[in-house]
Structures are given as C-alpha cells and as structure tokens.
C-alpha cells in the first residue's frame, strides 16, 4: 500500500494541499502510484524553494499552485530537484503577455518591437508563464508550456547559453547533435510540404536547436506516440537523459484500460 505524502495527520488536515485532485489531469494519469508519490514529494519541495508570483490580477490558489509544481517536477522526476536550481521565482500572467524585443538584422541595425509571448526562461533569472497556456498544458496533446521552459533551464546547465544539448557525457554530444539536427531537417521538410500550421510537430522545433530540444521535450512527455516512431534514435537519447520512458507508460495504461474493458460484465 502506498503512503501518500500529502495524507497528513488529522490535526493538520486543514492545511493539507490538494495533491490528489492536482494529479487528476490527463498528462499525469499514466504515472504509477509510486511515480505519482515521488512526483508529489518533489513538488512539495519545489513549492518550498520557489516563489510563485501572480501578476496583473491573476489569482493563484492552492490547486493551481500544486498543478504548476507537478508540471515543473515531471521532467526532473528521475534527475532530481537540484536540476531546477537555476531560478527562484515563477512569474505568472493571466494570459499571453507583451514584451519589448530587441534584435539585430544582417547589416547590424538594431530594431525594437513589441511582441506577444507565452513564456520566457531567463538564463540567470525567473521563468515567466501565463495561465491560459498552463491550462492547455494539462492534456496529453504535444503542447506543454511549463515543460518547454523547464527544458530551456536544463539546456543552459551545459553552458552559458541554450544549445539544444543538455548536460550529458561528452562522448554522447556528437551523436545527440547529429540526431537533433536530423530531426530539425525532417520537420523543416514537412513544413515546406504542408505549411507551418499543418505540420504534425510544432514548426517552432525547426527554428533553432535549443527550441527543437524544448519542443521535443513537450512531445516526449505529452505525445510520445508522435515522437518515438518518427525519431527513434533521438527518442532513445531523450529516454536516457530524462531517465524516463513516457511511451512505455502510455502502453501500460492502454493495456490496463483494454484489460478492464474486456472484463466488464
């Protein structure tokens, strides 16, 4: 029998966080009880160590806080919470937000423009999110804003900037880069055939190696059935890095559901 970490003494019941309800989102239903228990333990520590800051009138209750923490900790379920040491605050807007962006063109002219962002991950600063896209991250759909921004944080542990290559043994870097760029080229070829909106993998993955790693991390956890068969070699590298196999979880859950259906009388 599993001893759930959120089942506290009766005297402390009033302050217990709603972990069981927080776990009820589709993305987390494939986890075993042991994995869910481990994830909650990490999420409790995450909420103790990080500050969630609601902005522009957004209301942050305990259930929302728990679900945000669970999604932050899913990628580091086996890596450990220390992999999220690079920031202390999570800023949360109610919806996508406008930022001032500065960029330099091919001839060296600097341009400024205002753009709408869903999230940001500052190298030596906070992660910035918005609640509308966080809610869309609860489903197993291939989109997950929190996992995307966490992937950027994991990526930058390997150096000063995100490169698409997380902190892995040096002997594996060349193979990782080869498979990642092959995936980018494959996605770009599909985009050229069907267009950005019709591509089966988010077209943003073809824009940059760091974005490819972040986007495919979203698919790794929330749509493994799309990632694994298309890029099997890169899939194995992701499994080795994250020390998880979401496709195996999905198959296990589907097998359980099929068994239950055949035994209904």
Swiss-Prot record:
Zn(2+) binds at residues 111, 148, 152, 211. Keywords: Aminopeptidase, Cytoplasm, Hydrolase, Metal-binding, Metalloprotease, Protease, Zinc. The keyword Mitochondrion does not apply. Its EC number is 3.4.11.-. Binds 1 zinc ion per subunit. The keyword Protease applies. Disulfide bonds: none annotated. One of its GO terms (biological process) is proteolysis. It holds the Pfam family Peptidase_M90. It comes from the Bacteria. Signal peptide: none annotated. It is found in: Cytoplasm. GO terms for cellular component: cytosol. It is an enzyme of class 3 (hydrolase). Its cofactor is Zn(2+). GO terms for molecular function: aminopeptidase activity; metallopeptidase activity; zinc ion binding. Belongs to the MtfA family. Interacts with Mlc. PANTHER family: MTFA PEPTIDASE, PROTEIN MTFA. Involved in the modulation of the activity of the glucose-phosphotransferase system (glucose-PTS). Interacts with the transcriptional repressor Mlc, preventing its interaction with DNA and leading to the modulation of expression of genes regulated by Mlc, including ptsG, which encodes the PTS system glucose-specific EIICB component. This is Mlc titration factor A. The gene is mtfA.
